[in-house]
Regions:
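Extracellular Ig-like/FN3 beta-sandwich strand-entry sites
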Residues: 191-195, 236, 308-310
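Beta-strand-rich structural segments
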Residues: 154-159, 199, 234-252, 258, ...
Length: 342
């Protein structure tokens, strides 16, 4: 009773008994979650060390996101909690060891690409309209994430803070469901290529979300976080790379090897793709930078040099149209002068 607030690291199953014995003492989750997921993977794979990208797997001492957050959100004696972790990190490979090189605990992967539990938390921690469907809807005979013959049953998850959702597969309704707060919705449907669409209503406002079976990749796309950085030898920008099919749709299961080239006053200082079992180097010899897409995504970090100018970045893959972007580096002195003028 000396402690004004009791903290729990996991062990959410013990909270009810503790609260019964200490009904006036507030509780905070100082370390919660440790849900394990692999971005873009929808079948357990013990050989490659992947777990499904759904809120269903946790070590015995931890919990799913929905389990701990529902407990915290629905009890007044809970002050909230801290999630382990925001992002995957090197070490602590759980629940597998080799060939894993990092954890699966993150709401996002090592590159900051969201996993599906990102949208669960976003649904209940923000006022933003959220409507998210998973899994993706691609079938490949040999894909990195998921193999399903036509007709096989698939659990389709929808994360949302809308009041209700109706799910359609190729225009045919699979049923309408009401959304319980702090939860998610799930339909079991038989796979067929095409379009999955969720139609939701939130306080009378209509929300829609579609995912489609894509074609094969034809084009590399580069999306920079910043297109202007300081020429101070320290500032950097992150470039996210994806590939599109002929209809301009992002291909979520692509695994193309992407090569990177750049010229100008800066350098590539690292690459990644969020794959917890990738043994590719994060740093490459000059002129040999490359990274394979992991479930459709990879990343490059460019750091500025000390001279102002234009960095020209190019990304290419065999058989695909190149992608690229320009990054302007500007002197810190010019920025300081602008700030003084203001």
């Amino acid at each position: 009773e000396v402690i004004p607030v009791r903290s729990f690291n996991y062990r959410q199953f013990a909270v009810a008994d503790y609260h019964r014995d200490h009904p006036e003492q507030p509780i905070i989750g100082t370390e919660m979650g440790s849900t394990v997921t692999t971005r873009g993977i929808y079948e357990k794979d013990t050989v490659r060390g992947y777990v499904p990208d759904q809120d269903i797997t946790a070590p015995w001492w931890a919990s799913t996101a929905e389990t701990w957050w529902t407990l915290a959100a629905t009890n007044d004696f809970w002050l909230g909690g801290f999630v382990w972790t925001g992002m995957d990190y090197r070490g602590e490979p759980t629940p597998y060891q080799w060939p894993n090189i990092n954890s699966h605990f993150g709401i996002m992967d090592m590159c900051g690409f969201p996993k599906n539990i990102y949208y669960y938390y976003q649904s209940w921690w923000t006022d933003k309209d959220v409507l998210h469907i998973s899994p993706h809807w691609n079938f490949r005979e040999k894909g990195p994430g998921w193999n399903k013959p036509v007709g096989d049953s698939i659990d389709v998850w929808v994360n949302t803070n809308a009041d209700n959702v109706e799910l359609f597969l190729n225009g045919k309704s699979k049923g309408k469901k009401d959304m319980s707060r702090n939860s998610h919705l799930k339909w079991t449907v038989n796979y067929e290529p095409g379009t999955l669409e969720a139609v939701a209503y939130k306080k009378g406002k209509k929300l829609t979300k579609k995912i489609q079976t894509t074609g094969l990749p034809v084009e590399v796309v580069v999306t920079p976080y910043k297109t202007t950085i300081l020429a101070d030898g320290k500032d950097a920008t992150v470039l996210n790379l994806t590939v599109l099919d002929r209809e301009g749709r992002e291909v979520p299961d692509a695994d193309n090897m992407i090569q990177f080239e750049m010229e100008g006053p800066g350098e590539i200082i690292g690459v990644g793709n969020g794959d917890p079992s990738s043994h590719e180097p994060d740093k490459c010899p000059e002129g040999a930078w490359q990274r394979r897409l992991f479930n459709g995504k990879c990343q490059v970090i460019i750091q500025a040099g000390t001279k102002p100018g234009m960095i020209k970045f190019n990304a290419k893959a065999t058989g695909l149209w190149n992608g690229g972007t320009d990054i302007q580096t500007i002197s810190p002195e010019s920025v300081a002068a602008i700030n003084i003028d203001k």
